[in-house]
Structures are given as C-alpha cells and as structure tokens.
C-alpha cells in the first residue's frame, strides 16, 4: 500500500480538480502508458489493485512504472456521529489525477499483452482511460 512518509498538513482541505494535467502527459519511461481522461481521486487501494492486475497478466516479463502517488489524506467521521465536534480523522490517502495524466507505464512486453494488461488495470480504476504507445497516438 502506498502511504506518504511525512505530511506537511495532517488534515488538508479537499480542493478542486480544475483543468488538465500540467505535466506527466506523455509516456516517459516505458513503451506503453495508461492515460486518465477524467478527473478523480484515485485511492492507494485502487492503485495497488491496478498494479497487481497488470503484474499478474504480464507475469515475469516486462517492467511497470506507477507515475502517481497518494499524497493527499482524506478524512472521515465515524458512523452515527453527530455533526460538529471538529473534522474527522484521516481515513485513506488519494492521488489527485487530472485529465491527460499518464498513471501507469509498461515496457518489455508485446503491444497486445500490454494492451490487455492495461485494460485489466483500467477496470480497477473509477475513471475512463486510454492506452498510449510511446511516440504514437492511442
């Protein structure tokens, strides 16, 4: 599970997901990538589930890069608690993903296998995605 070592703030505000991703919009490390088409909070559990789905599909061949990290803590109040009495305690960590961000990359496998592995990973995520090939289009 991906969890930040140290936080600047324990309970940050939620913020807004305006606009498109500034950086990380192209395949940098591998040959193939999985790009987000919608804005969302991706939890550390979803990232881990997608990673496991990809690595199981490609078995021992290939290498996988995870380009997003869940830096943002999300708080939650306990069940059946009255309103007020402060903000809830941090429950999970999320990565803020904007449209255009390449979340996962892969190399060392064929395009068909990479496409299938990325499809399995995309099913674990709550957003629409697309498959990218380095240097080319989708």
From Swiss-Prot:
Keywords: Ribonucleoprotein, Ribosomal protein, RNA-binding, rRNA-binding, tRNA-binding. PROSITE patterns: RIBOSOMAL_L16_1. InterPro entries: Ribosomal_uL16, Ribosomal_uL16_bact-type, Ribosomal_uL16_CS, Ribosomal_uL16_dom, Ribosomal_uL16_sf. The keyword Nucleotide-binding does not apply. GO terms for cellular component: cytosolic large ribosomal subunit. GO terms for molecular function: rRNA binding; structural constituent of ribosome; tRNA binding. Gene3D superfamilies: Ribosomal protein L10e/L16. GO terms for biological process: translation. Belongs to the universal ribosomal protein uL16 family. Part of the 50S ribosomal subunit. HAMAP family: Ribosomal_uL16. Binds 23S rRNA and is also seen to make contacts with the A and possibly P site tRNAs. This is Large ribosomal subunit protein uL16. It comes from Rubrobacter xylanophilus (strain DSM 9941 / JCM 11954 / NBRC 16129 / PRD-1).
């Amino acid at each position: 599970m991906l969890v930040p070592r140290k936080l600047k703030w324990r309970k940050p505000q939620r913020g807004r997901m305006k606009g498109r991703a500034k950086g990380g919009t192209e395949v940098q490390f591998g040959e193939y990538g999985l790009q987000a088409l919608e804005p969302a909070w991706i939890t550390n559990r979803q990232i881990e589930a997608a990673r496991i789905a990809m690595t199981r599909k490609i078995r021992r061949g290939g290498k996988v890069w995870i380009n997003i990290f869940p830096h943002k803590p999300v708080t939650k109040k306990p069940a059946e608690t009255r309103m007020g009495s402060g903000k809830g305690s941090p429950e999970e960590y999320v990565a803020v993903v904007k449209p255009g961000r390449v979340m996962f990359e892969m190399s060392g496998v064929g395009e068909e296998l990479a496409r299938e592995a990325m499809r399995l990973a995309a099913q674990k995520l709550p957003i629409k995605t697309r498959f990218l090939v380095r240097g080319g289009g989708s």
